[in-house]
Design a protein with these regions (language model features):
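Acyl-donor (CoA/ACP) binding surface of acyl/acetyltransferases
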Residues: 1-49, 88-200
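Generic structural signal for secondary-structure transition and capping sites
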Residues: 50-51, 76-79, 142
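Conserved GNAT-fold acetyl-CoA-binding loop/helix
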Residues: 52-73
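Short, hydrophobic secondary-structure boundary micro-motifs
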Residues: 53-55, 83, 197-198
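Short gly/ser-rich anion-binding loops that grip negatively charged ligand groups
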Residues: 57, 61, 81-82, 89
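A short helix-loop-beta-strand connector motif used in the catalytic cores of GNAT acetyltransferases and
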Residues: 73-87
Length: 200
């Protein structure tokens, strides 16, 4: 399960309410919120260990039933303004990737987990996707802090996170849904750091 960032920020009541509203209102042509129609496609993608093995917070075992529950749970959290599970579709309308934004509105903070279908990995689109997701969390959701983790041996994700300008802050224990833990690399970035890095 996700844990809020190590660095503690306190949102004002107005900021917290705005973040919750932004999460609840997200979606549209450019951002497809996962629904029942995506269960089979997500299951097929996540059943591939090349996709799912590095990700600690996926439902296990990966079955259509567990993925359907995960989508339902994510939607319930979206209605509270605390989570957003989205899918990327390819030209044929098949699930090509997913992103799950976990949001702590009271902390003005968020994290993202996600993956691309195995046949689309190493296509150099990962860094662009990370940049889009960062912009979305800061500009659309309105959080002031993003925290990210990656498995110690997940070289590809670590390289993308480093390249995006996140600060490495050591290691943390990530807790899986079954209660077991995984040692993870840990990064943070503030909105101010992102603005400085990306100012034209």
């Amino acid at each position: 399960m996700s844990a809020p960032p190590v660095t503690v920020l306190q949102a004002t009541p107005q900021e917290e309410a705005a973040i919750r509203a932004a999460v609840r209102g997200a979606g549209g042509d450019d951002l497809v919120v996962a629904g029942p129609q995506h269960v089979a496609g997500l299951t097929a993608m996540l059943a591939d260990p090349r996709v799912s093995d590095p990700i600690y917070d996926l439902p296990r075992p990966i079955t259509e039933e567990s993925v359907a529950r995960w989508i339902e749970q994510s939607e319930a959290l979206r209605q509270k303004g605390e989570c957003l599970l989205t899918v990327a579709l390819d030209e044929a309308g098949e699930v090509a990737g997913y992103s799950r934004f976990t949001v702590w509105p009271e902390r003005s903070a968020a994290e993202i987990a996600g993956a691309r279908r195995a046949d689309l990995q190493n296509s150099h689109a990962g860094k662009a996707g990370v940049a889009r997701s960062i912009a979305f969390m800061f500009e659309v959701l309105g959080v002031r802090m993003i925290a990210l983790t990656a498995a110690l041996d997940n070289v590809r994700s670590a390289a993308s996170i480093d390249a995006a300008g996140f600060r490495r802050m050591g290691e943390v224990d990530s807790v899986r849904p079954d209660g077991t833990t995984r040692r993870s690399l840990y990064w943070e970035m503030t909105r101010e750091e992102w603005v400085r890095t990306h100012r034209l």
